[in-house]
Amino acid sequence: MCIRDSSNTSVWFDTSGKVHFGHQSTDSPKEATTGFQLIVSDGKLTVGKGGPRHPRTAIGANESGEILWLVVVDGRQKGFSEGMDMHELATIMKELGCWRATNMDGGGSSVMGLINKSGEMKIMNSPSDRFLGLKRIRPLPMVLTIRKKSS
């Protein structure tokens, strides 16, 4: 299922593991999720300069869809990170080599974890979500999990 809202875009992986972005699947997706707007399309930035700086999450791929980038930007933490506006995020994604990239849910939802060989998860960034003044990992109904392909 792909989102048909013109302001959102779907991200899906085909059966060969290549990533695709857009509103219509050209192949039956094996896995899919939705993001917000495309910030890089056909190697060009699609967002203007300025706007608010927030924690951000983005997913992007090279032109062939064989290399995937997941980026999390911390924010709302004075003296540590103020976040990025959409143009800054799009610029980073393009500089990484993304042909297409989309903005995902951000703010306190911007968290990146890594599971080590022992099966323990380590949070790799400094999430901005707070509850009763305490920093926490926001409970989320959906996460995007990427794992190494089995040999």
Where are these regions (language model features)?
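Gly/Ser/Thr/Pro-rich low-complexity, intrinsically disordered segments
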Residues: 1-151
